[in-house]
Amino acid sequence: MEYKLVIGLEIHIQLGLKTKAFCGCKNEFGGVPNSRICPICLGLPGSLPSVNVELINSAILAGHATNSKIRRVVKFDRKHYYYPDLPKGYQISQNDKPICEGGSLLIETPSGFKKINIIRIHMEEDSGKSLHLLDSENQSYIDFNRSGAPLLEIVSAPDIGNGDEAVAFLSSLREIFRYLDLSECNMENGSFRCDVNVNLIVNESGIEYKTPIAEIKNLNSFKSIKAAIEYEELRQQEEWIQFRKTLDSCGKHTRGFDDKSGITVIQRNKETVSDYRYFQEPDLPLIEIDDFYIDNIKNLKLIELPFDARVRLKAQYGLSDFDVTTLTSDKHLLRYFEDAVINSSDPKKVANWILSEVLSVLNDKGISVLEFNLLPSHITELVEFIVADKISGKMAKKVFSEMMARKVPASVIISENQLEQISDEFVIKQIVLEVLNENPKSIELYKKGKDHAIKFMMGQIMKKSSGKINPILANEILLQSLANV
């Protein structure tokens, strides 16, 4: 008996638009409950929605970024269901004619690149938010500030084979939306939410069976998503062995994931499309989009995406997979690097400095590269001093610290403190000879194979030069001189 895990994802991304999807209320996170609402948000009688054109523009841009086909006629539908945080009793969404279809993303797996197909991207509005207070057993509250917030829902094909692939797909999608400034994609504040559909294909003696699909909710991190998938795979294997439930006989159900226990718990049977009683939104007209409009959004707003940037950086600068992945994790960090290497003779060394020293400072201070107080050109100049052997790597770190403290270029600090390395071979030979003449016992110890003698003499050389001598060159000249003694 063989099991194949099948995973599909439904991702809701709240767009960072100034106003909501179908009214003029501000689209912001948090704030005083029920302070950003209007009759349209609440679905009061007589209120009429109007489409936020930026919602359509964002959907078109997302379609371009995911290689999707973009529909030329936009239609909105009413999706009916009853829940306390949905005051209208329906959600404005898209049913049979989503704005984008047939897209795909490439993800990187241990065995190479894998294409994950995207079934559809559609536009809709968010619901309100139910608040259940810990100090009250009988009362719940509803904040409608989120009601009507603009959403895109991305539905992947069931092409994902394990938790790692699911996380890779979500990470790639999040990177794209952040690069395009479409959304912060923050799972903590709910601007990036994911439901995971999981089932198994069981092969018994050449006959295939499909287990019931579990739609898993309450997933608040990539770690939770991976853990839920791994648990659900084992649960469905055990359920198949005991009860042999199939998709045809049991259909689809919803389960919640409990972070503390690491298990999924059944919530309800999943609604079918007919349960939602979809019909075309009568208060919103069909919207026609021509090719010029679609192409114009692509030309104006579609920038180089992370995957393409990684391929280019590896080819252009010979950087490692780790380096390019880290540099492209933030488009502002990538821009900082690109600005720093424009006039650099050693792009790899610039990358190393940004990924080690600069990122260390950013992480320690909890700031972004946009808030960093040194310009890319400052890093370029500092690295050039190292490449030219004018300062050592150790000295460069001290210079870097003073650069940040004083907000001045490396050249100013190096000049003021006379920190340039001594790399003149004639000068170094003179210092080496002085040390050899002053330490005949160390020479004898070296000839007897005592390695510590070399360290001692190098220490004396560094002391005589006040630490300014080029240690690599000094060590070479010392060994040459000892060979001739």
From Swiss-Prot:
Question: What's the domain of life for this entry?
Answer: Bacteria
What reaction is this protein's catalytic activity? L-glutamyl-tRNA(Gln) + L-glutamine + ATP + H2O = L-glutaminyl-tRNA(Gln) + L-glutamate + ADP + phosphate + H(+); L-aspartyl-tRNA(Asn) + L-glutamine + ATP + H2O = L-asparaginyl-tRNA(Asn) + L-glutamate + ADP + phosphate + 2 H(+)
Does Ligase show up as a keyword for this record? yes
Kindly list the GO molecular function terms attached to this UniProt entry: asparaginyl-tRNA synthase (glutamine-hydrolyzing) activity; ATP binding; glutaminyl-tRNA synthase (glutamine-hydrolyzing) activity
SMART domains, per database record = GatB_Yqey
- Keyword NAD: yes or no? no
Assembly, per entry: Heterotrimer of A, B and C subunits.
- Entry function: Allows the formation of correctly charged Asn-tRNA(Asn) or Gln-tRNA(Gln) through the transamidation of misacylated Asp-tRNA(Asn) or Glu-tRNA(Gln) in organisms which lack either or both of asparaginyl-tRNA or glutaminyl-tRNA synthetases. The reaction takes place in the presence of glutamine and ATP through an activated phospho-Asp-tRNA(Asn) or phospho-Glu-tRNA(Gln).
| The protein's name in its UniProt record | Aspartyl/glutamyl-tRNA(Asn/Gln) amidotransferase subunit B
Per the UniProt entry, what species is this protein from, by scientific name? Borreliella afzelii (strain PKo)
Q: What gene is this protein translated from?
A: gatB
